[in-house]
């Protein structure tokens, strides 16, 4: 952590202690219950904040090995987060490109390929459409490269896998995380060693 910021936060906490309060505000304010219960506000926040900014989709330990995957709901969208054969974390909408059926129903597992339960279109865990029944007779003109899973921007940082579920946006992860990078790295969310005993 930046030393000046660290000292500022310590001084702020000591000031609260001296003032015998837990609050930085001069007066306590109450928000309308509607702010917490409104479906309209919820949908606006989900689309304008959570769908547009990086969100934690998984911890790295959840998809440690190639083929590991988890299914998540991020900002109201079902996604698959997986690790491909090269060890790269990837994220896709959990939707078959043929008829829009949900590809994965399990919460987690290990698969090199995802097969749609509806018409058996099959995708590599790197997103490419690799096979479909009756391709030559039913879809002779199909360009398989155009029917890969819809990929999401995905990045691995601070022990987490982050995704942006608005596929029309590009977020500069380096710039986005710059203000907290030093502190987040110092905490080390990737590895945690605890002095414990499992003896019973």
Predicted feature locations:
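N-terminal pre-ligand scaffold of iron-sulfur
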Residues: 1-106, 152-155
């Amino acid at each position: 952590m930046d030393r000046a910021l660290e000292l500022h936060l310590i001084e702020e906490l000591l000031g609260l202690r001296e003032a015998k309060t837990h609050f930085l505000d001069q007066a306590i304010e109450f928000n309308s219950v509607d702010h917490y219960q409104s479906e309209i506000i919820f949908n606006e926040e989900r689309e304008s904040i959570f769908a547009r900014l990086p969100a934690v989709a998984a911890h790295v330990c959840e998809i440690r090995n190639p083929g590991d995957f988890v299914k998540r709901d991020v900002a109201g969208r079902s996604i698959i987060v997986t690790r491909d054969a090269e060890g790269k974390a990837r994220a896709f909408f959990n939707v078959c490109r043929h008829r829009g059926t949900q590809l994965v129903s399990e919460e987690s597992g290990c698969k090199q390929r995802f097969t749609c339960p509806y018409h058996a279109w099959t995708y590599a865990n790197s997103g490419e459409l690799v096979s479909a029944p009756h391709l030559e007779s039913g879809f002779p003109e199909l360009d398989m490269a155009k029917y890969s899973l819809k990929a999401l921007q995905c990045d691995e940082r601070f022990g987490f896998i982050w995704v942006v579920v608005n596929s029309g946006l590009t977020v500069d992860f380096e710039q986005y995380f710059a203000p907290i990078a030093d502190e987040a790295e110092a905490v080390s969310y990737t590895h945690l060693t605890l002095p414990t005993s499992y003896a019973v």
